[in-house]
Amino acid sequence: MQTRATHPPLSLAWTIWGFGATFYLMGFFQRVAPAVMTAELMQEFNLNATALGNLSAFYFYSYVSMQIPTGILADIWGPRRLLTAGAFLAAVGALLFAMAPTIFWAYLGRFLIGGAVAVAFVGNLKLASEWFPARYFAMVSGAALFFGIVGAVFAGTPLRILVVAFGWRNTMLASAAVTFMICAGVWVIVRDYPGEKGYADFTDAAATRGNNSRQRIFAGIVEVLRYPNTWLLFVIPGGLVGCVLTFGGLWGVPYLSTHHNLPTTQAAALNSALLVAWAIGGPIFGGLSDRIGRRKPIYFFGYTLAVIGWSIILFIPNLPIFLLAALLVITGFASGCIIISFAFAKESVPANLAGTVNGVINMGVISGPTLLQPAVGWMLDRYWTGALLQGVRVYDLAAYRAGFLLMLVWALLSLILLFFTRETRCTQLS
């Protein structure tokens, strides 16, 4: 008979965690889905670039606002209830978006999706901290990013093929149905702690459950903000995530189609290559950081490589297609270094605040695309020359460069801020 003195086998830990990660996959799918249906959405709702940027960013508006509450709820409710509720509301939001008669309802659907899937990543980090030994945390965090990017890849060329074949509304309806099934799976399979399955917990579960007092909630927020690494790691990852998700999640496909003369499906494939490389880079950078016992040097190397890559991709003209593809892969891979932020921040505060600090950091991570997607859209409209193609606005190279400059500035400033972080040497603050 299994005793509580034995920790759960890794196979069970991966299974429990995997159901939560599947929800994160679907959340990432919804996050970047507008990138391959920009023309359909602009035509359906009569949108300019600013309005399209806002439609995509409505996901991020609610996503960002939910990050600190999500971190707190992960500590208080536990990941099972949190992920189940999130998956249910995300399915409702996808249904609303797919059936939207006007742009208002499309905005509302995207807003609901973003707020609902906001729980996915932090919930998965909570599962990782409870079901795996501490030495696995950065690698499992990177694996979560991998799952997310798999969702983004499905939202590339495969989604484009489905949109062409069945229309964007029917395709989004199908995604809502899949999300309802994920909701059911999480509720049936996932458990908060190994102790609920008869195994020994890796953490002091009683201490991490806490209570629902208002004083505890606000004290947790105030406490994590006392540590300088929290502030720095709030800002730093948003620079690269803003580049990846503003380009790969919205403006990359129309840019590559217009200025590299690629068919939409090929542009979507290059976009997917960027995101796949990002997915692969996350667990590799996280695992390498764990292996050498340092956070800062690996993070700095990856960040520097990514900034150089984005500078070339966005501002050097007439790149051969094979070189452009190689640069997108290298830059996406290097951008995976941002996953180190979560282990870095977790080690910088007391262990009982892990959920709260990861919520704060994830809020900073997603603030990049939240601000940059509509900002780049605004710059595109500001520099628009009046060109139209089948009733949809077309933007010239100068307009794209003006918008993309915003992305690069944030990334460069974040690279500078990385110098000021305090190394944890992969050791949890006691």
What spans do the regions from the language model cover?
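Cytoplasmic membrane-interface "Motif A"-like loop-to-helix N-cap segments
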Residues: 76-87, 290-304
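Cytoplasmic helix-loop-helix junction between adjacent transmembrane helices
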Residues: 109-148
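Helix-breaking motifs and short loop linkers at transmembrane-helix boundaries and internal kinks
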Residues: 46, 78, 99-105, 133, ...
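C-terminal ends and interior cores of transmembrane alpha-helices
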Residues: 88-101, 304-318
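Helix-loop-helix hairpin linking two adjacent transmembrane segments in secondary transporters
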Residues: 144-195
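Conserved MFS/SLC helix-loop-helix module at the cytosolic interface between two early adjacent transmembrane helices
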Residues: 65-104
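Extracytoplasmic gate region of multi-pass secondary transporters
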Residues: 34-36, 227-285, 369-377
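Juxtamembrane intracellular "pre-TM" segments in multi-pass secondary transporters
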Residues: 2-9, 193-234
